[in-house]
Amino acid sequence: MTLLTASSRAAARLLGAKNSSCIIFAARHASTSTNLKDVLANMIPKEQARIKSFRQQYGSTVIGQITVDMLYGGMRGMKGLIYETSVLDPDEGIRFRGYSIPECQKLLPKAPGGAEPLPEGLFWLLVTGEIPSQEQVNWVSREWAKRAALPSHVVTMLDNFPTNLHPMSQLSAAVTALNSESTFARAYSEGISRTKYWEFIYEDSMDLIAKLPCIAAKIYRNLYREGSSIGAIDPALDWSHNFTNMLGYTDPQFIELMRLYLTIHSDHEGGNVSAHTSHLVGSALSDPYLAFAAAMNGLAGPLHGLANQEVLVWLTNLQKELGEDVSDQKLRDFIWNTLNSGRVVPGYGHAVLRKTDPRYTCQREFALKHLPKDPLFKLVAQLYKIVPNVLLEQGKAKNPWPNVDAHSGVLLQYYGMKEMNYYTVLFGVSRALGVLSQLIWSRALGFPLERPKSMSTDGLMVLVGAKSG
């Protein structure tokens, strides 16, 4: 009988140990300190030594092949990054430091009386690989509350943006302006040792995560609530609860939804646009504010962070055309018309996943519990029964199953947040938990400047022996 730590657990999953009866996966609660930085300081030398030994033994080992199609196809499937905080399994979905979403829902601490995991706990897990105690999560909540205040120039900036400036543009600009507060940029200019980089990246990351709800809430209030005040941070409340209050929502169910939303959107391994962007920009030793702002510019792209909006637009058009109570056959016909016109069914399929996205599943379970009779949810549930079969009949989709975007917008709409242009800002606030966790480790492990080799088409043709004419 073997008990696995978080890192060993993730490796065992990859090696197929999930079917072995001789292995028991144990939730790892190794550290007792409530100070996250102290816990990290103890972990980092051990991880540095582990990786150094691994590279000495296996540094020249070949791990895969690169094809011409990979270069032209967005580097899909190419193993080219180290990203510690999460791994995306095609069949099981995302694993945060080895833990699936259902496991995180079960093991991570909750708010008093709550049923959903607190994002503070997920952040602790991403940074340390350990399931935190309630006391450790409470420490993170208090720490973020202490660091949340915005500098006056950022407040002035947000209050003077034109109302036609997209919420994501406002988020990116405000985060960039926070660079004035960077402890890392200041320390780097003073010549700190490379071994100390991670300490200042940690401080900036904690500050940024703490301030993001204030920035995001201010954007929301300015655009959609006539500039009304976001109020003050309550140090007795958790991060999501404070964020929801500042947005102007007090429904306990919506607060629970926000805890779930901010947890499940936090990380999706390192190859997606926002995660890779933060890793790339951070490798130039840009501070976390600049790296995260760059990531948000990537998230703002329609192929990355706008998919949940596209789902809602498609659902709204469907309802307008067919009404609320639609037969399965009419839905099938509508889906086929969508496909035959050269469009896709938004919210279905994924670049890596080959099963239903577990982030979809947990949102579906939330809806079944809290809003089972909502017409839009009932439509989404009906589509879940029909769309995959139609896509399989069509024969083009590698993955006919729903992803996270097929559901999140419906839940937000139900609780009154109907401003679709804003949804990607929520996504961005959540994604900070993952990409900044990795940024801390990238500097702790001394990852170098990212600089892959590019090729021209002519050069590639010469390399493979093709005729260039």
UniProtKB/Swiss-Prot annotation:
Which Pfam family, any one, appears in the UniProt record? Citrate_synt
Its EC number is 2.3.3.1
User: Could you state one GO cellular component term attached to this entry?
Assistant: mitochondrial matrix
Report whether Transit peptide shows up as a keyword of the record. yes
**What GO molecular function terms would the record report?**
citrate (Si)-synthase activity; identical protein binding
Reactions mediated catalytically: oxaloacetate + acetyl-CoA + H2O = citrate + CoA + H(+)
Active site (catalytic residues) = 304, 350, 405
Coiled-coil ranges from the UniProt annotation: none
Q: What's in the keyword line of the UniProt record? A: Mitochondrion, Transferase, Transit peptide, Tricarboxylic acid cycle
The record ties this protein, via SUPFAM superfamilies, to:
Citrate synthase (SSF48256)
Q: Which PROSITE patterns does the record match to this protein?
A: CITRATE_SYNTHASE
Binding sites annotated in the UniProt record for oxaloacetate: 359, 431, 451
Main location as per UniProt: mitochondrion
According to the record, the segments passing through the membrane are: none
Its GO biological process annotations read: carbohydrate metabolic process; citrate metabolic process; tricarboxylic acid cycle
Instruction: Spell out the subcellular localization from the entry.
Output: Mitochondrion matrix
Alphabetical list of Gene3D superfamilies matching this protein? Citrate Synthase, domain 1 (1.10.580.10), Cytochrome P450-Terp, domain 2 (1.10.230.10)
Q: Which pathway is recorded for this entry?
A: Carbohydrate metabolism; tricarboxylic acid cycle; isocitrate from oxaloacetate: step 1/2
Keyword set includes Repressor? no
Segment annotated as transit peptide: 1-31
> Beyond the main fields, what else does the record say?
Citrate synthase is found in nearly all cells capable of oxidative metabolism.
Please give the function described in this protein's UniProt entry. Answer: Key enzyme of the Krebs tricarboxylic acid cycle which catalyzes the synthesis of citrate from acetyl coenzyme A and oxaloacetate.
- Indicate the quaternary assembly: Homodimer.
Family according to the record: Belongs to the citrate synthase family.
Please identify the protein, giving its name as recorded.
Citrate synthase, mitochondrial
The beginning of the lineage is:
Eukaryota, Metazoa, Chordata, Craniata, Vertebrata
